[in-house]
């Protein structure tokens, strides 16, 4: 297959950052994506409706002329978030979900939730008003090996939340393990998951074997090949519970290439092209449209996009860097070729 036309896709998990960087991140993701779920882990985080709506306005101001791109906003949950704030956010019409960051789990998560029991009243309110619950599924206990933190979170925390709030729609974000695939597959229809392009294309050998490659360092961290294969199997299965979420997370080049580098991989420059590569690798290009364009809006009870994009099997070379505000970001596949491009 050398051309494939699909309904315009959406990105159900992205980091757009703020300030001078917004112009560049919004330009990249709005080229082919119709909508994106925008992460709220800014500095300071978007912990209330006013902050999230102000962020929405800043994003919209950077959308290029002619683009219909629509950001979908998310509330950042803290120990102090109130049920009233959830109701207010839902009523805004712009905020479609709230996000659990276990405190310290990832970039700018220090304001996050210290004990999930602290937000049970909030989860009850979310269940009542029909707001989605997005989860960074890792424990933060330093005694737990970093490669085990997703599995332990599912076993010790997420399984309890799912049991206690059966009507709450939950997205386990950027899953990285067979454990997560199995959990989501076996859970009720109210539990779904996003999968990144880089977790489909790469495993920890790419990051660690033959030298450390810091631009593959992200959280949750890349796992072993057997987990990568489970993710590919889930994405290509046609199962409606799995959908596209890039978790594209830009950091300046010097913040990645450092003695203590930041976690995050940038894929917004070529998101759908990279997913096409991943699906082609398992002979499943016929399943790409459902994963990229149908399953996400269906789970969120939003309409599917009405227009299409066409991907062509035509190699192109990725630049070594892209502009990111007043600095540069090194994208995934920097200086190398990608097999697909959008016509």
UniProtKB/Swiss-Prot annotation:
One of its GO terms (cellular component) is cytosol. Its EC number is 3.5.2.3. The modification N6-carboxylysine is found at residue 99. The lineage of its organism: Bacteria, Pseudomonadati, Pseudomonadota, Gammaproteobacteria, Alteromonadales. It comes from Shewanella putrefaciens (strain CN-32 / ATCC BAA-453). Its cofactor is Zn(2+). Homodimer. It is an enzyme of class 3 (hydrolase). The gene is pyrC. This is Dihydroorotase. PROSITE patterns: DIHYDROOROTASE_1, DIHYDROOROTASE_2. Pathway: Pyrimidine metabolism; UMP biosynthesis via de novo pathway; (S)-dihydroorotate from bicarbonate: step 3/3. Binds 2 Zn(2+) ions per subunit. GO terms for molecular function: dihydroorotase activity; zinc ion binding. Belongs to the metallo-dependent hydrolases superfamily. DHOase family. Class II DHOase subfamily.
